[in-house]
Amino acid sequence: MKFSIIIPTYNNLDSLTFLINSLKKNSSFDHEIVLHINDGSDGTLDYAIKNNIKHTHSVNNIGLCSAMNKAYHLTTSNYILYAHDDMFFCDKWDLFLIEEIDKYDHNLYYLTGTNISTRFGLINHDCGNSISNFDEEKFHLFCQNDKTPDLQGSHWAPHLIHRELWDKIGGFSEEFNPGDGSDPDLCMKLWLSGVRIFKGVSKFKVYHFNSLTTRNNKVILNNGSKTFLLKYGINPRFFRKHYLRGNISIIPYIGILTNPIKNISFYYDLIKCKLKILYYKIVNH
């Protein structure tokens, strides 16, 4: 089974090559890698051309959502995997993902990897804070011994959906450029298309160096929570809590989801969302 791995990148060549090397080293199959290169004047564009890596290119940073949609047109696999350019994939990651995919006789699922980091990961385990001091052996040893269960309601990269779903929902919503709020928006579109399996596969681990690309290039983020709220009438936190039944921390996988439980907590949080919408309408009037 082959995946199409889309990687948007913005002048982050050292981290990108580190990621691609991990994919080549730790994959059991020869997956398709497709880049979208924003700018690329640091040598990224030359690297992609020299190594015959599929890529799209923009002179300026067009944002995560537009980058994903543009690169998607070069993909050929039925399985679309989105990854950050500052990750390191664990050994046999693809076998763990394939094992999960083989459980289903349909494609209504959204599967994610488990982020490991020094901080801000789903699991915090210090294997280094940059590629220069990354302890690969320590990371692989942790992956082999970790007993963390599969996770509920995860909506973090790397994540995989089927091509048919991507086409049905139209990929990423470009009103969320440069990218804040784009992942929960993607999940909401999947939810509205009938997806009820939102699962983090514990064995599929990546080490994440904390979005260095965004910080190093001083990208000004959009207000994704506001855009999501005005689009759907609820904020991403409400969606994560009451629909996905997940959190930014570890919650063991509970299975196929049902519609939200409309209890006191649901209505209390919903009222807060509606008041926030009213506030935005008054302020923007």
Please identify what each model-predicted range represents:
Residues S58-T75:
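Glycine-rich, basic loop-to-helix element that forms the pyrophosphate-binding segment
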Residues N21-D30:
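Short, acidic, metal-binding catalytic loop of nucleotide-sugar glycosyltransferases
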Residues F29, I37-L45:
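A conserved acidic beta->alpha catalytic loop
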Residues I80:
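Short aromatic/hydrophobic "clamp" motif used to bind/position activated sugar donors
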Residues D91-S130:
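Conserved donor NDP-sugar-binding/catalytic core segment of glycosyltransferases
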Residues N129-Q152, W156:
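Short, flexible, basic/aromatic active-site loop/helix in glycosyltransferases
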Residues Q152-G170, F176-F204:
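A short, conserved alpha-helix in the catalytic core of glycosyltransferases
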Residues I116, N177, K199-V219, T227:
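Active-site donor/metal-binding and catalytic loop motifs
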